[in-house]
Amino acid sequence: MNVVNTLQIIVANMLIYSTPLIFTSIGGVFSERGGIVNVGLEGIMTIGAFSSVVFNLTTAGMFGSMTPWLSILFGALIGALFSSLHAVATVNLRADHIVSGTVLNLMAPALGVFLLQVFYQQGQININEQIGYWNVPLLSNIPVIGKIFFTQTSLPGFLAIVVAILAWYVLFKTRFGLRLRSVGENPQAADTLGINVYAYRWAGVLLSGVLGGVGGAIYAQAISGNFSVSTIAGQGFISLAAMIFGKWNPIGAMLSSLLFGLFTSLAVVGGQIPGIKEIPSSFLQMAPYVFTIIVLALFLGKAIAPKADGVNYIKSK
């Protein structure tokens, strides 16, 4: 295997495995920039994956090759609805953010497996219509670069990069983003200026639900091709680490997700790559999770979160 083919395998798989992380970590950015800690990203991804797979199986005969894409939209919708539980608990009822997010993480896989038994009488379901690999028109014909970056790659991956750029623009260059960040930094001052703190915090959590649902749906539609209790398997927690490593910035979260995606891709395709295939597969499979622990240990104390992140707001009378 030559260098170009090796790089093509690594880059293509890195983009595929980082895509769910990019969407979900950006969702976490919106939630926490608004002041709501969302450790429930794992649960949101799980419910997004479950709902997208059910939609895929139900409508595949109707929509054909468009089914996976519509399934992603359905996963986004269900992710938003599921995240509203977190919004009610933290924004309206002023519950502890960590406890509320943990409830989502515990509820989602249990609910998914229960409904699988109810609907299909089994603990795992597979889909027939998946998102396949894609050659970028024109760009894939560029010598060397086209082979590495634009051949047999992931269309959702490129969409995720576009979403990251748009999210950065919304967060830092629009009135909505300025107000969302203000309620995450100093909600009292924002309220004094007439900004509805509760509404913007709700918006941040719902955006995290939409993007987390998309992340889970893409994982099911493009990577696993199924849903079971172990489908997501820590991807939400890795997304949370990517958000922290990226310093609550959409671009930083995207770059961090690409790095985590690289480690995950090496765990999957390492057996095909000279110099890596000699490493025991068990070490490669644990690498993404070990790297997550290292990142959190090194950067959690140093990364500066929004000042009011995790602080419940009580409107003054």
Swiss-Prot record:
Main site of residence? membrane
Does this UniProt record's set of keywords contain Nucleotidyltransferase?
Answer: no
- Membrane topology listed for this record: Multi-pass membrane protein
One Pfam match: BPD_transp_2
Q: Coiled coil: which residue ranges? A: none
TM spans, by residue? 9-29, 35-55, 62-82, 98-118, 132-151, 155-172, 203-223, 225-245, 251-271, 286-306
GO molecular function terms listed in the Swiss-Prot or TrEMBL record: transmembrane transporter activity
Q: Does the keyword tRNA processing apply?
A: no
User: What top-level branch of life does the organism fall under?
Assistant: Bacteria
Cell compartments where the protein resides: Cell membrane
Q: Which terms in the GO cellular component ontology are assigned?
A: plasma membrane
Q: What induces it?
A: Constitutively expressed.
Report keywords, A-Z.
Answer: Cell membrane, Membrane, Transmembrane, Transmembrane helix, Transport
Per the record, the similarity remark reads: Belongs to the binding-protein-dependent transport system permease family.
| Purpose of the protein | Part of an ABC transporter complex involved in the uptake of all common nucleosides. Responsible for the translocation of the substrate across the membrane.
| Subunit text | The complex is composed of two ATP-binding proteins (NupA), two transmembrane proteins (NupB and NupC) and a solute-binding protein (BmpA).
Q: What is this protein called?
A: Nucleoside ABC transporter permease protein NupC
